[in-house]
């Protein structure tokens, strides 16, 4: 995953901060935060992929990462997105609930909407947790992600049903 992020950073000319193999994720976040502040970088994306809501140690790491972020920039994070695979189904609601307990979520990134999955669970997430979908992914190319459009999403969700 680290190599993949570094490769995407290279492709789009965006710096990527990584740590040594098996590094404490919070220390890598600290290094990224320090670099962003020192270089006047306005946007810092932190990828905590692989955090499963049923893995206490990984969720504890996520909590620690939140503390580190606030230590460096007390008013941060400004946005916290949860990436959800459109094919996850109702388990996505459970994920969103559990992650919301650890860190306030400001949006959903709905991925893999290019297959048969339609991602209708985001309606339940919006209803129960008031977390909007901000971005939607249709594939793996740089242009395959964009702002969420609720009208287009609903058309796709209902396509073939009515």
Can you annotate each of these PLM segments?
Residues 81-84:
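A compositional/biophysical signature of low hydrophobicity enriched in polar/charged and small residues
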Residues 97, 106-107:
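Helical hairpin unit composed of two closely spaced alpha helices linked by a short loop
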Residues 111:
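Phosphate-centric recognition/catalysis
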